[in-house]
A protein has these predicted regions:
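Structural preference for solvent-exposed beta-strand-turn elements
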Residues: 1-366
């Protein structure tokens, strides 16, 4: 029999992080449940859909050790709606009794023995990295942008983690755009594709942490902090050799304020909706002007201009949504936008000395 006391705030937060992983697979109804189990002086709260398992640990006053599984959404919504304060949890047979002030309930559960075994990674044998949480969250945002939603090309639905020239890189592509982030210096060798959905879970689960440990074995990845652990299967397959898509030089290089580039792009996009989002970017070296033109056959047309440093004249047509999305996630005051003619990939980087983020957008045929 388990009998513990926890705070409503910590329990609600942990349950809300776990509940979305609970699956609705009819063949395994127990995956709708989450696992509660005492673990030393803490309460373990875990959920899995057999592809990913997430575990949260919260401090608890433990009278009796034990475990149970209970419906994820019901218990999460119930605890979330309770007032702040202590919550008493007690198991009796296959039922969880919950008491908090004037509120009490009994939730039917299933014995923990029927719950799938939570996956683990052998830390001694794993490839390990220690990463600043904020740096990781930023890298996830910047690369997940280019992840494909096409499940028939599974390797493109994740983010590729790999080492190159002494650094750990993250990369993603959907065939129309490519994002690459240099994360940390490291000589540890890894080549693994992590599902984008796993990285989304990691991002929302580590808000209060400063460092996170990432461990890889041949088929799994584990993200671990003191109070959280997420273990996920890797995507099987070989990621494309994307580096050949990144141009080594550029005929036309444009240095422009990000705010100016964003404004003219968003205005042009208003008139590009009828034409599949296509906008034409023209660079004039003589006038130091970047102009963006778009046409809507029913509404009219638009040309917007911004001052920029331009190395050579050039013109290219892009999807306005792709350009707007990448400009929204770059922090720099100035952007370097470069290309080699109408049909070559366009490169977007921050205008800083050693930029660690590269974004590629393939042009549209104008």
């Amino acid at each position: 029999m388990m009998k513990v006391s926890v705070t409503q705030e910590k329990l609600a937060k942990a349950l809300n992080l776990i509940k979305d992983i609970a699956s609705s697979r009819n063949e395994l109804p127990i995956l709708n449940n989450i696992l509660l189990r005492t673990d030393g002086g803490r309460l373990l709260i875990a959920g899995t859909n057999l592809e990913i398992a997430s575990t949260q640990y919260i401090g608890a006053k433990i009278e009796d050790h034990g475990s149970i599984t209970i419906p994820a959404r019901l218990v999460s919504e119930f605890i979330t709606n309770l007032p702040s304060g202590p919550v008493e949890l007690e198991t009796k047979n296959e039922h969880l009794h919950i008491t908090s002030g004037k509120f009490s309930s009994v939730i039917n559960g299933v014995v923990a023995d029927e719950y799938p075994e939570l996956p683990t990674i052998d830390e001694k044998a794993a490839v390990q990295y220690e990463i600043d949480v904020e740096d990781l969250k930023k890298a996830i945002v910047q690369t997940k942008l280019a992840v494909s939603s096409d499940v028939t090309r599974a390797v493109l639905t994740g983010v590729y983690w790999h080492n190159y020239e002494g650094s750990l890189y993250l990369a993603a592509t959907d065939g129309y755009r490519l994002a690459e982030k240099r994360l940390i210096k490291s000589d540890n060798e890894v080549s693994a594709i992590i599902p984008a959905s796993t990285l989304a879970e990691v991002s929302k689960s580590v808000s209060d942490e400063k460092k996170i440990t990432v461990l890889f074995d041949d088929s799994q990845v584990c993200f671990k902090t003191g109070d959280m652990e997420i273990v996920s299967r890797l995507i099987d397959g070989k990621f494309p050799d994307y580096r050949q898509l990144i141009p080594a030089t550029a005929e036309t290089e444009i240095v422009i304020k990000k705010s100016d580039f964003s404004r003219v792009t968003k205005i042009a996009a208003l008139f590009a909706r009828e034409s599949g989002g296509g906008i034409t970017i023209t660079a004039s070296e003589e006038n130091s002007l970047l102009s963006i033109h778009s046409i809507a056959s029913e509404l009219g047309e638009n040309t917007s201009e911004a001052t920029a440093k331009i190395s050579a004249d050039g013109q290219v047509t892009l999807n306005s949504r792709y350009l707007t999305e990448v400009l929204n996630i770059i922090d720099a005051d100035e952007i370097v936008f470069s290309f080699n003619g109408k049909l070559s990939p366009c490169v977007i980087r921050e205008q800083i000395k050693n930029p660690d983020y590269t974004h590629i957008i393939m042009p549209l045929k104008s």
